């Protein structure tokens, strides 16, 4: 199966609505992201439903805890069979290393382990508010380097940082980019955004797209259009 670049961010508070949407799209066209709200509401059984339908799942729970607790949560995600799981890079090198090491017994079947750098809603004043006198881009660079040094597979970052991180950390270090809006879409609550084609050109490996697909009249067509637009730049 080809390496789908689009990850559709599911955002529903009713499982029936989520599955009704999922049944309109093809697992060959995208992967799916399940975040904190949906996982708290519906639990592992919902992830199993998505797996039954043939979808790869990015479990976006952003674990951040002491190394022992965080790594065990990552192992629980691996037991669920998810394709990707993430942890907050600000949890530090020991936490990330423990999380990576606990996945080693899974071999080729282990999920990708990704670090979260700076949330795309965060601006300089937000960082200042938590005691970080640093530009968001510099904090992203610092945390991304720490993530790579901890042996993780990549980071979540905004598309604006992608070319810089590819240059610094190499082409095999995966960049997962939220804040992607197809041309003509509403910006929503993301501060740092970019179109799918621009993001891939900038170095993003996977594109997280939510409402422009989930709220579309014909989500399958929107996905098809995005994938067609990406074909020349892959």
Curated annotation (Swiss-Prot):
PROSITE patterns on file: OMPDECASE
**Does this entry carry the keyword Lyase?**
yes
Task: List the NCBIfam families hit by this protein, alphabetically.
Answer: PRK00230.1, pyrF
Protein task = Catalyzes the decarboxylation of orotidine 5'-monophosphate (OMP) to uridine 5'-monophosphate (UMP).
Active site: residue positions: 62
Alphabetically sorted, this entry's keywords are:
Decarboxylase, Lyase, Pyrimidine biosynthesis
Q: Does the keyword Lyase apply?
A: yes
GO CC annotation terms, alphabetical: cytosol
| Gene Ontology molecular function terms on file | orotidine-5'-phosphate decarboxylase activity
Q: In which pathway does it act?
A: Pyrimidine metabolism; UMP biosynthesis via de novo pathway; UMP from orotate: step 2/2
Name the Pfam families for this protein: OMPdecase
Q: Which residues form a coiled coil?
A: none
Task: From the UniProt record, give one GO term of the biological process aspect.
Answer: 'de novo' UMP biosynthetic process
The name on file for this protein is Orotidine 5'-phosphate decarboxylase
Residues the entry annotates as binding substrate? 11, 33, 60-69, 120, 181, 190, 210-211
| Highest taxon of source | Bacteria
Give the catalytic activity. Answer: orotidine 5'-phosphate + H(+) = UMP + CO2
Known EC number: 4.1.1.23
Q: How does it assemble?
A: Homodimer.
Family the UniProt entry places it in = Belongs to the OMP decarboxylase family. Type 1 subfamily.
Which principal EC class is assigned to this enzyme?
lyase
